[in-house]
Design a protein with these regions (language model features):
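Contiguous, often N-terminal, cationic amphipathic patches that form binding interfaces
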Residues: 1-58, 67-69, 73-79, 84-107
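Residues within the alpha-helical elements of helix-turn-helix
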Residues: 64
Length: 107
């Protein structure tokens, strides 16, 4: 399976499928969409109201990667379940951390 992140200058680009009001804040692994695109499945307790769910995802990703919340920013999909986040930092260690937490081999 392809990976939902892509190395880019200054960090990573990460494709995420968000479930707001998911009962808990959690990263649930990688799945392929119907069109084959891989996404990181994330759920947050926050409702999709006034950006609360987006902020919840941003903070969850930062915490999981050991980064300050300011290192994670929403690039696209503010009002959609499918979102793209930009993660600033050393790309290789970030990719390795994502691979470890999702059980996927880092190329």
């Amino acid at each position: 399976m392809a990976l939902p992140w892509r190395i880019r200058p200054g960090g990573l680009e990460l494709r995420v499928r968000v479930t707001p009001r998911g009962g808990r804040d959690a990263i649930d692994g990688v799945e392929a969409l119907a069109d084959g695109r891989p996404v990181l499945k994330v759920r947050v307790r926050a409702a999709p109201d006034k950006g609360a769910a987006n902020e919840g995802v941003r903070r969850l990703l930062a915490e999981a990667l050991g980064l300050p919340a300011s290192a994670v920013s929403l690039e696209s999909g503010a009002a959609a379940r499918l979102k793209t986040f930009s993660i600033a930092g050393a790309a290789e260690p970030l990719a390795a951390a994502l691979a470890a937490m999702t059980g996927h081999a880092h190329p």
